[in-house]
């Protein structure tokens, strides 16, 4: 059976799939058969997968780990969760990296691989896999896939880049973020730790999109 972009499990147009004609058990069995027959598998993963696996971004988790940032910047619309806080207009680079180094640590670097990600990849270990993900937490790499099998459309928590885009190279910042995390004081890092582009000398930025 030829699969087109409009097809789903039962050959019906995906635009009509909201009107389901089979129960979930039947759909799951059909999906399992197709996965077994497939030579190549493309995994699409969004924030819902990491959330289902137990990742925390807001609520009491944010209040417990980012209380000093809420105290300094207020509990307005920004300081509610790790997503919103990333858009706060931090007054200087020391403050910007003071926040982002912590988010990188808690949102990616310090996270262990989740059982859900390991379970998924183990179930598909005999297949040729590629992952297209909007997640920045690096879970698929931690679960065992090589970086050439993963494309993170919104970047990740592990790299930084020239804010002026003077060149395309990404720089691994995991060691730097750990140092920033230890040196942070009053939500800011020391000025000497602020990263600068090695090519143009300008500011650096997270390898992330909004």
Predicted ranges, named:
Residues 1-210:
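Conserved catalytic core of sirtuin-type NAD+-dependent deacylases
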């Amino acid at each position: 059976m030829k699969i087109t972009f409009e097809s789903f499990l039962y050959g019906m147009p995906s635009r009509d799939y909201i009107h389901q004609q089979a129960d979930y058990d039947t759909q799951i069995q059909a999906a399992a058969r197709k996965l077994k027959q497939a030579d190549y598998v493309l995994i699409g993963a969004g924030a819902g997968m990491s959330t289902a696996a137990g990742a925390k971004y807001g609520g009491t988790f944010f209040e417990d780990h980012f209380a000093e940032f809420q105290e300094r910047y207020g509990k307005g619309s920004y300081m509610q969760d790790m997503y919103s806080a990333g858009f706060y207009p931090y007054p200087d680079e020391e403050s910007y990296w003071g926040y982002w180094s912590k988010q990188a640590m808690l949102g990616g670097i310090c996270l262990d691989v989740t059982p859900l990600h390991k379970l998924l990849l183990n179930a598909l270990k005999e297949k040729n896999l590629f992952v297209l993900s909007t997640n920045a937490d690096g879970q698929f790499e931690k679960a065992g896939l090589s970086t050439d099998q993963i494309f993170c459309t919104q970047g990740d928590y592990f790299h930084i880049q020239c804010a002026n885009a003077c060149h395309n190279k990404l720089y691994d910042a995991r060691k730097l973020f750990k140092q920033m995390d230890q040196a942070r004081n009053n939500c800011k890092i020391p000025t000497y730790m602020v990263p600068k582009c090695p090519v143009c000398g300008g500011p650096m930025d997270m390898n992330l999109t909004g």
